[in-house]
Swiss-Prot record:
InterPro entries: Aa-tRNA-synt_II, aa-tRNA-synth_II, aa-tRNA-synth_II/BPL/LPL, Lys-tRNA-ligase_II, Lys-tRNA-ligase_II_N, Lys-tRNA-synth_II_C, NA-bd_OB-fold, NA-bd_OB_tRNA. Mg(2+) 1 binds at E420, E427. Its EC number is 6.1.1.6. PROSITE patterns: AA_TRNA_LIGASE_II (PS50862). The lineage of its organism: Bacteria, Pseudomonadati, Pseudomonadota, Gammaproteobacteria, Vibrionales. This is Lysine--tRNA ligase. It comes from Vibrio cholerae serotype O1 (strain ATCC 39315 / El Tor Inaba N16961). Binds 3 Mg(2+) ions per subunit. Belongs to the class-II aminoacyl-tRNA synthetase family.
Length: 510
């Protein structure tokens, strides 16, 4: 018998067992509907305590002290285990046990034909402590609030299918503590970032999610249709151009935490729908952004995790202190010490396309015919240097031809005052001194249009209204985007973006 045939037989047996369990639970629900009020789904129980709060308040008290207190609580949650007369009840803050005397057990059997793992129950009773030192509630009153018709995965085969964890995130959250903790951390990260930005006098704003002209990043957009206006529209790939319009309008410090959409591939680092925090500050440059980023990330790590040092894979990442700063050109040289062509490369050579194509191919980059010298430099960097940037590092010196919205460097106009921030071998943030020269921006938009016509699907569109806004005057401004999903991956020691997005994009199940 082949492994494939055996696996098919096993899956069929699992399905049969699951269907049997579901049928038994439906039979119990029929009994409950006939014998209980509210058609078996009451909505009158009110809890007054959470397991986590009870542990903090009473966890250090002795068994005798709790008996003397006779503190009555009402708890509610999902039955996760049955251990003799004890039920393990799980809710948002943690777990607590409930003790069912023989009389209560008989009443549960008569009323509900017994409880199953996954049922949601409300319990009222005095708080006690077991001989092992565990808190529990003595079940004096109880109510089955929701009958679970499907067994939890570990009841029949365990939640081992990674894809099923993403498709049925609700089940994953019930049975997987690591998943729950990751999304608790995510929520805290969002709150910490928001509070930090507000403390720095940034105003939170909301800009359109549907754009007439997609812009603010180099990416392929999703296209939709506005029925009332009878016109195509695009889900936003970035809020940048709208946020900078607000700076033109006089809001000197703005930020937005929201979703972006890019019609591109799926990977451990990419999801078509993702969360970004973008912010813009007038009268600042890209160096100010790097300083602010150091302060922001160390503050968030300390607030959320209680430390600026944390594990990531085999490494320990340090969010505190000053971060390394290195130009893209220098990083390529640093991480390719034995590549003769790269070691001989000068900044002037970067503009020699034939040479850059040769180097790119030598490091296994699949070169597109429409790539510019700047794109070739970035691809060489991405292939040979980026994966090695484990500790927080700002990479500066991005060429202008791949930075259409960034201000040119005063020292060398081939480059821009731009950086990308890397940690854990991946990009987490992108920032630069904004291009506020309307005529230069006009020329760069036109160059992007030419690139799009040459086959670059990710090149930007021409945005005439944004040029008009710049012609009204954008003050010297710096702006940055931070990928929330990738940041949470780092803070939770997670290596795929799907583990930090509650409902990631998936193909329909066959």
């Amino acid at each position: 018998m082949t492994d494939a045939v055996q696996n098919e037989i096993n899956q069929e047996q699992i399905a049969q067992e699951e269907n049997k369990l579901i049928a038994e639970r439906r039979s119990k629900l029929d009994h409950i509907r006939k014998n209980c009020k509210a058609n078996g789904h009451p909505n009158s129980f009110r809890r007054d305590s959470l397991a986590g709060d009870l542990q903090k308040k009473f966890g250090e008290k002795s068994k005798e002290e709790l008996e003397a207190l006779n503190h009555v609580v009402s708890i509610a949650g999902r039955v996760m285990a049955k251990r003799g007369p004890f039920l393990v009840i799980q809710e948002t803050s943690g777990r607590i046990q409930a003790y069912a005397s023989k009389e209560v057990q008989q009443e549960l059997k008569d009323k509900y034909q017994g409880l199953d793992i996954g049922d949601i129950i409300g319990v009222q009773g005095a708080l006690h402590k077991s001989g092992k030192g565990d808190l529990y509630v003595n079940m004096e009153q109880f109510q089955l609030l929701t009958k679970a018709l499907r067994p939890l995965p570990e009841k029949f085969h365990g939640l081992t299918d990674q894809e099923m964890r993403y498709r049925q995130r609700y089940v994953d959250l019930i049975v997987n503590e690591n998943s729950r903790n990751a999304f608790i951390v995510r929520s805290k990260v969002m709150s910490a970032i928001r509070n930090f930005m507000i403390s720095k006098q940034f105003m939170e704003v909301e800009t359109p999610m549907m754009h007439v002209i997609p812009g603010g990043a180099s990416a392929r957009p999703f296209i939709t249709h506005h029925n009332a206006l009878d016109m195509p529209m695009y889900l936003r790939i970035a809020p940048e151009l709208y946020l900078k319009r607000l700076v033109v309008g006089g809001f000197d410090r703005v930020f937005e935490i929201n979703r972006n959409f890019r019609n591109e591939g799926l990977s451990p680092r990419h999801n078509p729908e993702f969360t970004m925090m973008e912010f813009y500050m007038a009268y600042a440059d890209y160096k100010d952004l790097m300083d602010l980023t150091e302060e922001l990330l160390s503050s968030v790590a300390l607030e959320v995790l209680g430390s600026t040092s944390m594990p990531y894979g085999e490494h320990t990442v340090e969010f505190g202190g000053k971060y390394a700063r290195m130009s893209m050109f220098d990083a390529i040289k640093h991480y390719n010490p034995n590549h003769a062509q790269i070691q001989a490369l000068t900044e002037e050579d970067i503009q020699n396309r034939d040479l850059m194509v040769s180097i790119a191919k030598s490091v296994h980059v699949d070169v597109e015919p429409f790539w510019t010298c700047g794109q070739l430099l970035e691809e060489i960097f991405g292939e040979t240097a980026e994966p090695k940037l484990m500790q927080p590092t700002f990479i500066t010196g991005y060429p202008a031809d791949i930075s259409p919205l960034a201000r040119r460097s005063d020292d060398n106009p081939f480059f821009t005052d731009r950086f990308e921030f890397f940690i854990g071998g991946r990009e987490v943030a992108n920032g630069f001194s904004e291009l506020n020269d309307a005529e230069d921006q006009d020329a760069r938009f036109k160059a992007q249009v030419e690139a799009k016509e040459s086959g670059d699907d990710e090149a930007m569109f021409y945005d005439a209204d944004y040029i008009t806004a710049l012609e009204h005057g954008l003050p010297p401004t710096a702006g940055q985007g931070i990928g929330i999903d990738r940041l949470v991956m780092l803070l939770t020691n997670t290596h795929t973006i799907r583990d930090v997005i509650l409902f990631p994009a998936m193909r329909p199940q066959q």
